[in-house]
Amino acid sequence: MAKKERPRPEKLSVYLYIPNIVGYMRVLLNCVAFAVCFSNKPLFSVLYFFSFCCDAVDGWVARRFNQVSTFGAVLDMVTDRVSTACLLVILSQIYRPSLVFLSLLALDIASHWLQMYSTFLAGKSSHKDVKDSTSWLFRLYYGNRIFMCYCCVSCEVLYIILLLIAKNQSENLLNVVVATLTQISPLSFLLALTLFGWSMKQTINVIQMKTAADVCVLYDIEKQQKP
């Protein structure tokens, strides 16, 4: 007796998951934001930050309606990385030395790509599973949502502030930051607050890249030792 074939899941249904639709909205918001990033900085800031906030919304919606999907997770991470990369490229055209922002871009992409690939090699279901990490800061980042949120928000807000306070092309980054911090204003307080969270995030990115590289090397060693 022939076995009945299981019905194939509809691809379209996954594309139309509510959290994935939120993801498409994020992409659209970012497209509009970057289209006006030089002509209307305040509008860019509002659209970009709103898109960033939707990052938390799509995750909550996915869990609330049981619509967690691999496609959604990939869409979420790609949107995050691309939007941050675009903003860093813009800042590299405004401030000098531009290498600062290009280095941050390289670190962000390299650390997250290595982390995702090492997660695949280790057979883990999520790149946020770092319970076996020897770094307490790395475990704290992925284990404490409040701390993670603070670090991520600090990075994005800092980059937005730098875009808003730039008056001319080819600004000196250090001079602008020091001048803003010495003004003793709500903006200087916010800048200082975000600088600390930003520094934590970059430290974690370095740890993440090194930890992921270790996993890849360990995988190669174990592969060579197999008969």
Swiss-Prot record:
<keyword id="KW-0464">Manganese</keyword>
<feature type="transmembrane region" description="Helical">
    <location>
        <begin position="142"/>
        <end position="165"/>
    </location>
</feature>
<protein>
    <recommendedName>
        <fullName>CDP-diacylglycerol--inositol 3-phosphatidyltransferase 1</fullName>
        <ecNumber>2.7.8.11</ecNumber>
    </recommendedName>
</protein>
<keyword id="KW-1208">Phospholipid metabolism</keyword>
<feature type="binding site">
    <location>
        <position position="55"/>
    </location>
    <ligand>
        <name>Mg(2+) 2</name>
    </ligand>
</feature>
<dbReference type="GO" id="GO:0005783">
    <property type="term" value="C:endoplasmic reticulum"/>
</dbReference>
<keyword id="KW-0479">Metal-binding</keyword>
<feature type="binding site">
    <location>
        <position position="59"/>
    </location>
    <ligand>
        <name>a CDP-1,2-diacyl-sn-glycerol</name>
    </ligand>
</feature>
<dbReference type="InterPro" id="IPR043130">
    <property type="entry name" value="CDP-OH_PTrfase_TM_dom"/>
</dbReference>
<dbReference type="GO" id="GO:0003881">
    <property type="term" value="F:CDP-diacylglycerol-inositol 3-phosphatidyltransferase activity"/>
</dbReference>
<feature type="transmembrane region" description="Helical">
    <location>
        <begin position="101"/>
        <end position="122"/>
    </location>
</feature>
<feature type="binding site">
    <location>
        <position position="76"/>
    </location>
    <ligand>
        <name>Mg(2+) 2</name>
    </ligand>
</feature>
<keyword id="KW-0472">Membrane</keyword>
<feature type="binding site">
    <location>
        <position position="69"/>
    </location>
    <ligand>
        <name>a CDP-1,2-diacyl-sn-glycerol</name>
    </ligand>
</feature>
<feature type="binding site">
    <location>
        <position position="55"/>
    </location>
    <ligand>
        <name>Mg(2+) 1</name>
    </ligand>
</feature>
<feature type="binding site">
    <location>
        <position position="63"/>
    </location>
    <ligand>
        <name>a CDP-1,2-diacyl-sn-glycerol</name>
    </ligand>
</feature>
<feature type="transmembrane region" description="Helical">
    <location>
        <begin position="73"/>
        <end position="95"/>
    </location>
</feature>
<dbReference type="GO" id="GO:0046872">
    <property type="term" value="F:metal ion binding"/>
</dbReference>
<feature type="binding site">
    <location>
        <position position="80"/>
    </location>
    <ligand>
        <name>Mg(2+) 2</name>
    </ligand>
</feature>
<feature type="active site" description="Proton acceptor">
    <location>
        <position position="80"/>
    </location>
</feature>
<feature type="binding site">
    <location>
        <position position="76"/>
    </location>
    <ligand>
        <name>Mg(2+) 1</name>
    </ligand>
</feature>
<keyword id="KW-1133">Transmembrane helix</keyword>
<dbReference type="InterPro" id="IPR014387">
    <property type="entry name" value="CDP_diag_ino_3_P_euk"/>
</dbReference>
<keyword id="KW-0594">Phospholipid biosynthesis</keyword>
<keyword id="KW-0460">Magnesium</keyword>
<dbReference type="InterPro" id="IPR000462">
    <property type="entry name" value="CDP-OH_P_trans"/>
</dbReference>
<feature type="binding site">
    <location>
        <position position="58"/>
    </location>
    <ligand>
        <name>Mg(2+) 1</name>
    </ligand>
</feature>
<comment type="function">
    <text>Catalyzes the biosynthesis of phosphatidylinositol (PtdIns) as well as PtdIns:inositol exchange reaction. May thus act to reduce an excessive cellular PtdIns content. The exchange activity is due to the reverse reaction of PtdIns synthase and is dependent on CMP, which is tightly bound to the enzyme.</text>
</comment>
<feature type="transmembrane region" description="Helical">
    <location>
        <begin position="42"/>
        <end position="61"/>
    </location>
</feature>
<keyword id="KW-0808">Transferase</keyword>
<dbReference type="GO" id="GO:0008654">
    <property type="term" value="P:phospholipid biosynthetic process"/>
</dbReference>
<dbReference type="GO" id="GO:0005794">
    <property type="term" value="C:Golgi apparatus"/>
</dbReference>
<keyword id="KW-0812">Transmembrane</keyword>
<feature type="transmembrane region" description="Helical">
    <location>
        <begin position="177"/>
        <end position="200"/>
    </location>
</feature>
<keyword id="KW-0443">Lipid metabolism</keyword>
<comment type="similarity">
    <text>Belongs to the CDP-alcohol phosphatidyltransferase class-I family.</text>
</comment>
<feature type="transmembrane region" description="Helical">
    <location>
        <begin position="12"/>
        <end position="36"/>
    </location>
</feature>
<dbReference type="GO" id="GO:0016020">
    <property type="term" value="C:membrane"/>
</dbReference>
<dbReference type="Pfam" id="PF01066">
    <property type="entry name" value="CDP-OH_P_transf"/>
</dbReference>
<dbReference type="InterPro" id="IPR048254">
    <property type="entry name" value="CDP_ALCOHOL_P_TRANSF_CS"/>
</dbReference>
<keyword id="KW-0444">Lipid biosynthesis</keyword>
